[in-house]
Amino acid sequence: MNAPGERLGLPQIGKARPFALAMIIDAVGSGLFLPFSLLYFHYAVGLSLTEAGLGLTISMLIAVPTPLAAGVLVDRVGPRTVAVATNAARVAGFLGYLLVHDLTALIAVALLISVSDRLFWVAQPALIGEFATSGSRDRWFGLTVALRAVGLGIGGLLAGLAVSSLGIVGYHALVVANAVSFALAAVLIASLQVPRRASVAGLAKPGPKGFRAVLADRPFCWIVASNVVFGIARTMILVGFPVYAIQVLGAPAWLAGVLYAVYTALLAVAQTSLVRRLEHHRRTRALMLSALLWAGSFVLLAVAPLLPRQAIVAYLSAVTVLYTGAVMVHAGVIDALVIEAAPDTLRGRYVGGFNLSWAAANALAPGLFTTLLGWYAGLPWIALTALLLLALVGVRRAEPRLAWQAVHVRSDQPSGMLS
């Protein structure tokens, strides 16, 4: 690899260029629509904000178990096939949004997209595990985080321009553009060259099969349980920061957007370089570090009401940097740990089982935060700090029992693709 690429912590892209392009196109498309999804259904479709939020929530809740089925599907037909099919389904879903006129139709179409999203987010890590060498997987996952941050930022900027200049037509244009982005991503992923898959029968080992094997892997289950807490912590930039900053600390409304911009910019600029620095350390120790960084940022938030109001903007900006550091450390190792912990024949099931931790975190975070906030302003951050310390203990307990390659980065291997 050239020196600049090595310093930046980039993998050798090589024949995986279609995958990298697909990821950034996917992210740009998502950035076009996600920030304006509720507003689209309100202004362009005519639903109330309550109906739009209810429809999207119902569809996402119904789709929660999807990762389990996705894991089986990925193991049977391969992650590339699943990734292509789910992007095609997303195209159909977003074009279907143009035909939505009531709550029932919204739930039906949103369910197709929610299921497709969860299928894709099981297939994508498994696909990286299939085409990338063991020593390069951390870098590939770091690159996907950075590309997604860049793409979401670009998409959000373009979406704001489209809506402000085109009005209702702009909202429809966002939906069509997102559908086109998924179509392009499907074509690019279909063109990706991956090693020929060995037959499952030929690689099967004695012992529990299917999801029973995942459940029997107790150290891995400790990681999954700990990641529920990490997942809740990762949602706080959207779920907790804006409400706490504006309603509790009296910060100006524009600060929430600025803090999220700082968060996104740091992910885009620093994620891959940080992954390179983490390669010489155990992945489990990096997870423990992320727990401590998150805990530190939440303690600072808990005591923020004691500060003078004029110091809040600078203070929250500094806390956001610390919080983002925790996110980057966690994101830099967690997916590679899951892939390396999984036997090749059960990779999809391991990723699917692990993705339930994200589903649980996303479901729990809003209610947990608002309930605790209603009791006492600092209680959400105190409770999360305690949970993070428990998660740290869980990771520490799992560390000596995890597979060696799940804990250690095999940096002796080239940071490129399998052939």
Sequence positions of predicted segments:
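Cytoplasmic helix-loop-helix junction between adjacent transmembrane helices
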Residues: 109-148
